[in-house]
Amino acid sequence: VSNLNIRKVAVLGAGVMGAQIAAHLINARVPVLLFDLPAKEGPKSGIALKAIENLKKLSPAPFGVKDDAQFIQPANYDDDIEKLKECDLVIEAIAERMDWKHDLYKKVSPHIADHAIFATNTSGLSITELSKGFSDELKARFCGVHFFNPPRYMHLVELIPTGTTQPQILDQLETFLTSVVGKGVVRAKDTPNFIANRVGVFSILAVIAEAEKFGLRFDEVDDLTGARLGRAKSATFRTADVVGLDTMAHVIKTMQDNLPDDPFLPLYETPAVLAGLVKNGALGQKSGAGFYKKEGKVIKVLDPKTGTYVDGGGKADELVGRILKRPPAERLKLLRESDNPQAQFLWSIFRDVFHYIGVHLESVADNARDIDLAIRWGFGWNEGPFEGWQTAGWTQVAKWVQEDIDAGKALSKAPLPAWVFEGPVADKGGVHTAEGSWSPASKTFVPRSSLAVYDKQVFRAPLAGETGADPKTYGKTLFETDTLRAWLDDRPGEDDVVIVSFKSKLNTMGA
């Protein structure tokens, strides 16, 4: 069963996410039906038709070739529900309301093919609670498949099973998403906001809290927390504006409502500045104003003290810029010891995230690799948070974090778990090793997935501390120049294709 061939997909819900997922499946040459409610006037599939037209105007472009929009088949639940039987995978992407989703599941269930997989693209609702909208037979073929926005460009897809999901369904979906759709798949537990948003949004909340504590401006913080840290250029507040401040507030509220026993609960209060912006309809980029506002050609930044927009230009101090260029261990030590408020702020946000992932690893993920890859692929960090901790010196950093917790400087009093300080992780100097990545539940280093689809990937996204194949030397080199290397994969049966790797800056071809 594990080689189910997904030949046709239905996407239910022609909103922003549903339509873009459909577009990306078309990019991958997978036939797609895009369903929505029957329109009250005009053509019955008018809602889906309009969504397909809107896709052509979206930026960044959801299609590789704009004219491919014609290949999405618009559909509505009145006329086309029988066509669901033709689909091997159904992805539900309607609004985040449990009752609406359950109503839809009841309506479409009789029309789902016996072999088909049904997956929800929810970002915050419990997959287990959602599964209660299905018969036992369909529950076994149901899971969460969480794409990140915009789905053509974001590498991450989280796969979330329930206690009743058949394991082979997950293998089939992971294989399809990896090989056909070109995604990086991380399997998550059914906990609020799964892995990437749980840790990534905590990181944003920590930045907001520490920026306020140290009296830093939003544009100053963005200069400190973007490319200088090897993270997305849009850094923190610009990212929030792009995502939409209402969406941000919704994700934070999910944590507040569903994590009553979390030791970091006080932080899951929507920050006053964010709540104020949402209340005034300043939702970020889509409404023209958020933390930033474009006035003509000038981008202004919110001054939270006055509530007005002022000229931007806040930057990292020269001293802090110099510290950030130092090697990882020295960098953290200097930030921690400096009196400069920007340096203190940076040490604090590193500490807060290390504290959080240490406390929560066991409850949110199977192992440390899943957290690092989720944050790299879902939030655009060059290195995951556990990698950052490990490369800076695992034991020393752990001591510093615990010292700050004991001194009341951290965002929670929760101590770091025992596995951080003693046993295999302390002995190996971190969570990522040649054997695999640390799983607190099984108390072992868990190796990478052995799914057959990964045999094709000689260089899987490497993590600090692992020992994988080195792309610079792997295989049998045929010839090499300053700008490129031609080589063969010398594994049996793989040695019939010459591979050329570019070594030049931006992969340019020299004359």
Question: In which residue ranges do the predicted regions lie?
Answer:
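N-terminal glycine-rich phosphate-binding loop for ADP-containing cofactors
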Residues: S2-A511
